[in-house]
From Swiss-Prot:
GO MF terms held by the record: L-glutamate N-acetyltransferase activity
Gene name of the encoded protein: arg2
Taxonomic source organism: Aspergillus clavatus (strain ATCC 1007 / CBS 513.65 / DSM 816 / NCTC 3887 / NRRL 1 / QM 1276 / 107)
EC number annotated for this UniProt entry: 2.3.1.1
Organism placement in taxonomy: Eukaryota, Fungi, Dikarya, Ascomycota, Pezizomycotina
Record's subcellular location: Mitochondrion
Chain's role: N-acetylglutamate synthase involved in arginine biosynthesis.
GO cellular component terms, A-Z: mitochondrial matrix
Family: Belongs to the acetyltransferase family.
Entry protein name: Amino-acid acetyltransferase, mitochondrial
GO biological process terms on file: L-arginine biosynthetic process; ornithine biosynthetic process
Chaperone recorded as keyword: no
EC main group: transferase
Segment annotated as transit peptide: 1-36
């Protein structure tokens, strides 16, 4: 058999693991569709729109095209990851997920030799008075319990639930860019289920037609991508007329089967009534929540007569079938605005901590617009600051660290109706993300971004005849998040550290992100509460680490696990209890910071205002559990709370000169100083510290004088 033979479509399709199927719209479209092989096997490949006069040249051109496609894919992959290590680690995880379990080798029990039982008298009389050996060696047939056949558990399906809002306002270039990104996510092991949101209209029939047309449009764009299959599903949702806001999935199997077959499934917010089958439009947000509920295994209602253990096992099996890893909202408005003219959108939202404050901020913006302000801008919102604008550790950047935007880039005024509509859209996206993530495991996350940003980052670089130095490819927010489970920009990174990008044409582009990364997150506990009373160096009853409100054993475990060293607890308590400024705890002691007020050597602690003014705000311990390091934004949450809520006027700390975390510290500090004759580097976030020689000497003296409280000597020179 010739290995280079070109197979016809029918024969080729039978050899592939995943067959290429056409969506409903494509059966009646005029597009000429291309059949693609799977990502793992591209030995056989054909294209309906590609021809050549020579078969050898045809095969060569196909190979060149395949190499170009692979190059484009991996360039997008590597450019979307912060480091090559992140891309490599994700590919290793992806490979491990798809490795089948090795079957266990059957083991045969050794044949046992027949033993002649002793007589009751206890005297061994040989075999003369006993039965013959053949009797003892005769096999005995016993009916044992029938083993339950093991049911092969299907491979867990990793899904992303995507809501694409008002795609009719997007041109074909944007739709193609979104389709390309969805196809790349599928190649990376994240299958996408897309819900089309056509917006609002008075005519329900017109809205249904519009939703169907846009679903077909996206399905065709996805199918044109290499190795991609798309399918528009109808009759997925049902609704009870008594509760039109609570649609539900008609058939779980009908929804999951095309997803398991590798299709990108496109859905519309059309449900069918249960009493009399009739197509009705439902809210796209309600449809997304219904899909989330079903895919999370929470849509089944337990039978009151069913054993609770049986119910739990049944729900557990459903949850093991599917892992809904991402909830992606593609909306022209982009990420949730921070209402700070020095930044465009929230980079990261910890829902457990921030949701109420950000919702109140958006509601307040809506009220200001409703009051009749026709020229409302983001700076106007800051004239009426909410609690999030003043104290939220993940929302407001330190004013002195941020370079103001030029007047030309200020937010342009909008008419009140458009402003109100925009704020309502942001509110809906925020609430939908919160409700969806509340039903999912803490490992799941959400992304709110604009289709334009996704499409622009998916553009193919055009070769240039000029020999110029170009810029790095724009990172795709969806692929970057899949690889790293982090936002494009660290939420604790000051804007002044996000330098401008110089393009090939010499144009300065500020590094901004219109993408918001959302996590269900973790609660943040700050003791004492700085919103009740700001932390002060004045003499007052101070918090102690052995206070009943603090779980000291868990705090000690956090420190020892993070530093990988044993703490001398009593010595540490004796040192910090009388000078403790406060404590920051993220989640269930997954991360934390211990902050103190330190007096420079030689300064008396007499409570005078002069000596109290010389107290140095000091970060004594900054710890994150090993299992939480580098993921979930725990370090960012704690650090932001420290520099933006607890010590907004500045704080200092020290770190060993060879500490690998120093690069992270350097990016977030305002200055560093290597302490001579020691193994320490001093960091600070205090503005103008270098100009104040007395304060600088106090900071340096404190960082030199503090003695460690470790229980054993590990050989590390402090």
């Amino acid at each position: 058999m010739n290995p280079n033979a070109v197979w016809p479509r029918t024969a080729q399709s039978s050899l592939k693991k995943h067959q290429v199927s056409l969506c409903t719209c494509q059966r009646r479209s005029h597009y000429r569709l291309r059949s693609f092989s799977t990502f793992a096997d591209r030995k056989i490949h054909q294209s309906a729109g590609f021809s050549s006069s020579s078969k050898n040249h045809d095969r060569l051109s196909h190979r060149a095209r395949e190499k170009l496609l692979d190059r484009e894919f991996f360039l997008s992959l590597l450019s979307s990851a912060s480091t090559q290590r992140e891309a490599k680690s994700y590919l290793a995880r992806l490979k491990a997920q798809h490795q089948p379990d090795l079957p266990q080798k059957p083991t045969s029990a050794p044949a046992s030799t027949a033993k002649i039982p002793p007589l009751p008298s206890g005297v061994n009389l040989g075999s003369f008075y006993g039965a013959s050996r053949s009797v003892y060696e005769t096999p005995v047939f016993r009916q044992g319990p029938t083993p339950t056949p093991r049911q092969d558990q299907p491979e867990r399906l990793h899904l992303a639930l995507v809501k694409l809002s008002i795609p009719q306002t997007l041109d074909d270039t944007i739709i193609d860019g979104v389709a390309k990104t969805l196809a790349q996510l599928d190649r990376l092991g994240l299958t996408c289920c897309v819900m089309i949101d056509p917006g609002a209209a008075e005519d329900a029939r017109l809205l249904r037609t519009l939703a169907t047309e846009q679903a077909d449009r996206l399905a065709i764009a996805i199918h044109k991508q290499p190795d991609s299959k798309s399918l528009r599903l109808d009759s997925v949702l049902s609704v009870d007329p008594a509760t039109p806001h609570l649609p539900k999935v008609l058939s779980r199997k009908a929804l999951l089967k095309p997803l398991r077959d590798g299709h990108t499934v496109i859905l519309t917010p059309i449900a069918y009534t249960e009493d009399v089958p009739r197509a009705v439009m439902v809210s796209a947000d309600d449809a997304v929540l219904a899909l989330t509920r079903e895919l999370a295994g929470l849509a089944t209602f337990p039978d009151p007569d069913e054993d609770p253990l049986t119910t739990a096992e049944r729900i557990g099996r459903l949850q093991k079938e599917v892992s809904l890893d991402r909830v992606i909202l593609l909306h022209p408005l982009g990420g949730i605005p921070a209402f700070n003219w020095r930044q465009s959108s929230h980079v990261f939202i910890n829902m457990e901590q921030e949701y109420d404050d950000i919702e109140n901020e958006l509601l307040q913006a809506r009220d200001v617009i409703s009051a009749g302000d026709a020229n409302l801008t983001a700076s106007d919102i800051l004239q009426h600051p909410s609690s999030v604008a003043v104290s939220n550790p993940l929302s407001k950047f330190v004013h002195k660290e941020i370079v103001p935007l030029p007047p030309a880039r200020s937010l342009s005024p909008m008419v009140p109706e458009a402003q109100r509509s925009a704020v309502e859209g942001h509110l809906e996206n925020l609430r939908l993300s919160q409700k969806a993530l509340a039903m999912l495991p803490s490992a799941s996350s959400g992304i709110i971004t604009s289709p334009i940003e996704v499409a622009n980052s998916a553009k193919t670089d055009q070769p240039s005849d000029l020999s110029v130095v170009g810029t790095r490819r724009q990172r795709n927010p969806l692929i970057h998040n899949l690889l790293t489970d982090k936002p494009l920009l660290s939420s604790s990174l000051p804007m002044s550290r996000r330098g401008p990008i110089i393009s090939a044409q010499g144009i300065l582009n500020p590094v901004t992100s219109h993408t918001t990364f959302v996590k269900r997150g973790m609660p943040l506990t700050i003791l004492p509460n700085p919103w009740v009373k700001p932390w002060s160096a004045q003499r007052q009853p101070r918090l102690r680490l052995d206070d009943p409100s603090i779980d000291l054993p868990r705090l000690v475990h956090l420190i020892e696990d993070s530093f990988n060293r044993k703490l001398d607890v009593q010595d540490y308590l004796n040192r910090v209890n009388d000078r403790l400024a406060g404590l920051i705890i993220a989640g269930e002691y997954e991360g934390g910071a211990i902050l103190t007020w330190e007096l420079p050597p030689g300064v008396q602690d007499d409570g005078s205002a002069e000596n109290s003014a010389r107290m140095v705000p000091y970060l004594d311990k900054f710890a994150v559990l090993k299992r939480s390091q580098g993921a979930g934004g725990v370090a960012d949450i704690v650090f932001n709370a420290m520099v933006r809520t607890c010590f907004p006027n500045g704080v200092c700390w020290r770190s060993r000169k060879n500490n690998p975390v120093n690069k992270w510290y350097f990016e977030r500090s305002l200055g560093t100083w290597k302490l001579s004759d020691t193994n320490w580097t001093m960091f600070w976030t205090t503005p103008g510290l270098v100009e104040d020689s007395q304060k600088f000497r106090d900071y340096e003296a404190v960082c030199r004088s503090i003695q460690p409280s470790w229980a054993e000597d590990t050989g590390v020179v402090d």
